[in-house]
Amino acid sequence: MDLTGGFGARSGGVGPCREPIGLESLHLGDEFRQLVTTLPPENPGGSFTALLELPPTQAVELLHFTDSSSSQQAAVTGIGGEIPPPLHSFGGTLAFPSNSVLMERAARFSVIATEQQNGNISGETPTSSVPSNSSANLDRVKTEPAETDSSQRLISDSAIENQIPCPNQNNRNGKRKDFEKKGKSSTKKNKSSEENEKLPYVHVRARRGQATDSHSLAERARREKINARMKLLQELVPGCDKGTDFGGKIKIKVCFGVHLLMISGKKVAIFLWKVSCEDLIDCSFSPPRIQGTALVLDEIINHVQSLQRQVEMLSMRLAAVNPRIDFNLDTILASENGSLMDGSFNAAPMQLAWPQQAIETEQSFHHRQLQQPPTQQWPFDGLNQPVWGREEDQAHGNDNSNLMAVSENVMVASANLHPNQVKMEL
């Protein structure tokens, strides 16, 4: 019976496919038992220590087997003269032969057992059970479990990858979030830059009830126009002033009174009436709606200039009727404006200088007529006497009938004035 051949055949069959652990353990136990029982030692005496470790029945059988083998060797030497060497010699001690196949199977068996005990996870293989007789066998034993470990690692890695979410998805989600954050931050930066780039003024005027930027160019230009027109109006009418009412509207106060003139024996009173912005908008003489304080001031200036022209025309007509009377309108207007600016807003008649001069001239004329003898009596003495003289004779007791006075004070709002504001008193 060739044990080595059987061992080789069995080991070749075990390489590709692994048998169950129970069967391999049984086979290994039988093989070890056969080796111990069938292979006697060369020196039975030297193997006595080994026999002590065996059961008593096996030790007796081994002793009887050595006796029979020695008799057979003597017969063989007598026939052939040469003693064949034993198959396996223990070398005086009970030692196992160096069978490479058996060692490989034992190492494989130990590796499989440890892998199953560790749950197919550990990557280290125990090499203490492998004897240190052959280095090549150790290399083979080390390489084989390394392959199994790598395969098991691959399997475990695949399972872990199936369980753990893919990091690429997380990276993509993170990149998307970062991109969205960057987009939001960029939009915020753009908004802030646009706000910084905005000019510090507003070109369009705010509506009524809304605040306007006092530092805007449009507001500055508007105020400059208003101030320029106000200065021009103050030059035309020295007593005018600008103010605001409770509603915030700008009102113009023109401080000159009513002028009383007598033309062809009739009193002529010129009034300057108070007009507000609403009256200006609803005026019939200006169909288009006029908006803006500067435009209103322009209309006021035009109306004041027209009134001044009318006064000049009336004074010229009065001078043509009676050239001896010097009205001196400039001094009259200056005195009236000064008195009104001082606060005399009581509509009381103001006595002027020219009626006194007129009365003095009339008295001197009558005195000269009385001193000179009448050379010729005119039939129409009334024609030589001026008209205002006759009226004075008729109303001799009333001293204040021929005086120019101011009837009321005038408050003009920021509006144009109606052109037909000349009232004739009969």
UniProtKB/Swiss-Prot annotation:
SUPFAM superfamilies: HLH, helix-loop-helix DNA-binding domain (SSF47459). This is Transcription factor bHLH60. GO terms for biological process: regulation of DNA-templated transcription. Gene3D superfamilies: Helix-loop-helix DNA-binding domain (4.10.280.10). Its main location: nucleus. Residues 210-307 form the bHLH domain. Coiled coil: none annotated. It comes from Arabidopsis thaliana. It comes from the Eukaryota. GO terms for molecular function: DNA binding; DNA-binding transcription factor activity; protein dimerization activity.
